[in-house]
Amino acid sequence: MAGKPVLHYFDGRGRMEPIRWLLAAAGVEFEEKFLKTRDDLARLRSDGSLMFQQVPMVEIDGMKLVQTKAILNYIASKYNLYGKDMKERAIIDMYTEGVADLEIMILYYPHMPPEEKEASLAKIKEQTRNRYFPAFEKVLKSHGQDYLVGNRLSRADIALVELLYHVEELDPGVVDNFPLLKALRSRVSNLPTVKKFLQPGSQRKPFDDAKCVESAKKIFS
């Protein structure tokens, strides 16, 4: 029997958080090995674990996978969260890439210089309210189904619900303006695996605070 996946990253959200979400939603237990110093990262580089010299890296099924999208694609395929055919996969990819466009803005926000944060937050709020959330609300309205693609849970739903939580940390109450997105969040959040992940003490990471930002700088800068 294969061991648990092992996630190599620092103790923060970053590019590993969607991987944590997807594994948790799939009901997969995983271990984490946190980088704490530049030396920790250097050791992974020197032993050949990091193909492109960077993390996230996930040990799974005898592989050492890098590149966030590749890792997510593998997990989604392995645990039947990637649609039933090529067309559904294409739509799922389109939706998850849209989510990623906004998520990357949120990811960088805590790490920005103080003088740039106000403009960045304003852009996040504007893009959320006028571009991304209306687009996904329209999708759900167009087919009237419980999930984004094929009327069953996929990685697109999980990525979107993660995004809804992250946006509300910066723009509280914004999801209330989008009733179908709010219903999707409730639906996914009440799935037993996701509900467990949302509980205190899980491997879900909090918003990157100043301490987390400093820890990341010690490793990566």
UniProtKB/Swiss-Prot annotation:
List the PROSITE patterns hit by this protein, alphabetically: GST_CTER, GST_NTER
Per the record, GO CC terms? cytosol; mitochondrion
**Main localization (coarse):** cytoplasm
Where does this one sit in the cell? Cytoplasm
The N6-succinyllysine modification is found at 4
Where do the coiled-coil regions begin and end?
none
Matching SUPFAM superfamilies: GST C-terminal domain-like, Thioredoxin-like
Q: Name the Gene Ontology molecular function terms of this record.
A: glutathione transferase activity
The GST N-terminal domain extends over 3-83
Q: Which Pfam families match?
A: GST_C, GST_N
List N-acetylalanine occurrences by residue.
2
Catalysis: reaction(s): RX + glutathione = an S-substituted glutathione + a halide anion + H(+); androst-5-ene-3,17-dione = androst-4-ene-3,17-dione; pregn-5-ene-3,20-dione = progesterone
Give the InterPro entries listed for this entry. Glutathione-S-Trfase_C-like, Glutathione-S-Trfase_C_sf, Glutathione_S-Trfase_N, GST_alpha, GST_C, GST_superfamily, Thioredoxin-like_sf
Q: Whom does it interact with, and what assembly results?
A: Homodimer.
The record's function comment reads:
Conjugation of reduced glutathione to a wide number of exogenous and endogenous hydrophobic electrophiles. Catalyzes isomerization reactions that contribute to the biosynthesis of steroid hormones. Efficiently catalyze obligatory double-bond isomerizations of delta(5)-androstene-3,17-dione and delta(5)-pregnene-3,20-dione, precursors to testosterone and progesterone, respectively. Has a high catalytic activity for aflatoxin B1-8,9 epoxide.
The name this protein goes by in its record? Glutathione S-transferase A3
